[in-house]
């Protein structure tokens, strides 16, 4: 553990853990601390974080609070959704995709204020420590990283509270008892993990769900919306042009009201263990269905199938923290190229936990109704051509079968 750090930029939420980290950095490293708090759409007031940082001795000029919602959706969420990225077949990567942006902002601030270190509040068991630190090193190779949870001896809630009381860190009454589960949230999703959720055999209590109503409690009448796309990105809802963050927020409202986006899963962490989480991604679930809907009529079959083959690798890179890696950028270039004609409108029916595409249209549609119709007509497709096509594709199968017979 290096003690020659002069100034450190801390990813700061204003909560108990990062407030303890702030004071621990001051007392252990005896360095100047700069705080960065991001508004990612987590639904919390951020000014209390400023006041708490000031109370803990941070100079006003060393407190950075930034609304990054538009940048988050435009430059991180939307590029990821162009790929239809899903980790292990279920997880829409809501937590994973937020970490690179936070890391980027910390490095930008470090350069601005002349800091020689950055710090985060991720534990030594989870994925976030990897995501943050890979981002730091990719953007600033020589930066010093301080990960308090891997260094200190504050290994229990009791010790954290004792440290806070010793150093006069304000503790909200509801924080003195250990929370039944931990929550991480941003504009794309919220995740709940730990405590009451640790046994994967037990059903998650209803109070865990904070962003969606139960599908059973959703309206008995469907909500039908139309989402407009331009080059793979959603740009409008029901004909109203919206900014990326505003559009996602609107989809979140629609998804919440219809019980859409709940997910209870056990995933494989990058660090090697399995973890159980309850995720809510109402707007993202609708967006994914709609994007696949518009791609279904605008992407060539070969391009669509190749995208689906590449997607798991792309999703894994994001999950594991390699957003700034050459391979992710290479895949992104291919994915973005595929979206040149992914423009049009998709109609989606929202009903009791389901987002179902019921219509799609595009000026660049590859769907040819004349080719697929069962009615007679003068079209380029001749049924007789299928015979040769089938025979050629069956050639290797017939050859293999003949060999098997011969070997009997």
UniProtKB/Swiss-Prot annotation:
It comes from Azorhizobium caulinodans (strain ATCC 43989 / DSM 5975 / JCM 20966 / LMG 6465 / NBRC 14845 / NCIMB 13405 / ORS 571). Coiled coil: none annotated. It is an enzyme of class 6 (ligase). L-aspartate binds at residues 123, 127-128. CDD domains: ASS. L-citrulline binds at residues 91, 96, 127, 131, 182, 191, 267, 279. This is Argininosuccinate synthase. Its main location: cytoplasm. The keyword Mitochondrion does not apply. ATP binds at residues 11-19, 38, 121. Transmembrane segments: none annotated. Pathway: Amino-acid biosynthesis; L-arginine biosynthesis; L-arginine from L-ornithine and carbamoyl phosphate: step 2/3. The keyword Isomerase does not apply.
């Amino acid at each position: 553990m290096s003690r020659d750090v002069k100034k450190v930029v801390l990813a700061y939420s204003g909560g108990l853990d990062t407030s303890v980290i702030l004071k621990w950095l001051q007392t252990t490293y005896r360095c100047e601390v700069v705080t960065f708090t991001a508004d990612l759409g987590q639904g919390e007031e951020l000014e209390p974080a400023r006041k708490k940082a000031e109370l803990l001795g941070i100079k006003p000029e060393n407190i950075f609070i930034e609304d990054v919602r538009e940048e988050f959706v435009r430059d991180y969420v939307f590029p990821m959704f162009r790929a239809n990225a899903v980790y292990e077949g279920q997880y829409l990567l809501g937590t994973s995709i937020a970490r690179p942006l936070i890391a980027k902002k910390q490095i930008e601030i470090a350069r601005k204020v002349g800091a020689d270190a950055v710090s985060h509040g991720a534990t030594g068991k989870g994925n976030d420590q990897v995501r943050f630190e890979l981002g730091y090193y990719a953007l600033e190779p020589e930066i010093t990283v301080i990960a308090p949870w891997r260094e200190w001896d504050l290994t229990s809630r009791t010790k954290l509270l004792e440290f806070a009381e010793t150093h006069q860190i304000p503790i909200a009454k509801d924080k003195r008892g250990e929370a039944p589960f931990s929550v991480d949230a941003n504009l794309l999703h919220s995740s709940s993990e730990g405590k009451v959720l640790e046994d994967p055999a037990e059903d998650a209590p209803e109070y865990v769900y904070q962003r969606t109503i139960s599908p059973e409690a959703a309206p008995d009448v469907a909500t039908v919306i139309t989402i407009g796309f331009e080059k793979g990105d959603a740009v409008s809802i029901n004909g109203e042009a919206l900014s990326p963050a505003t559009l996602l927020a609107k989809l979140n409202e629609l998804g919440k009201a219809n019980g859409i986006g709940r997910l209870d899963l056990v995933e494989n962490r990058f660090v090697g263990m399995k973890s159980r989480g309850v995720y809510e991604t109402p707007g993202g679930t609708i967006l994914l269905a709609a994007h696949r809907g518009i791609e279904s009529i605008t992407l060539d079959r070969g391009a669509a199938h190749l995208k689906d083959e590449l997607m798991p690798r792309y999703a894994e890179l994001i999950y594991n923290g390699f957003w700034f890696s050459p391979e992710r950028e290479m895949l992104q270039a291919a994915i973005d190229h595929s979206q040149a004609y992914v423009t049009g409108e998709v109609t989606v029916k929202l009903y009791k936990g389901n987002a179902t595409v019921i219509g799609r249209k595009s000026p660049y549609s590859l769907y040819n109704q004349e080719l697929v119709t069962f009615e007679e007509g003068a079209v380029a497709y001749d049924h007789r051509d299928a015979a040769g096509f089938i025979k050629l594709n069956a050639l290797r199968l017939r050859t293999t079968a003949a060999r098997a017979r011969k070997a009997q």
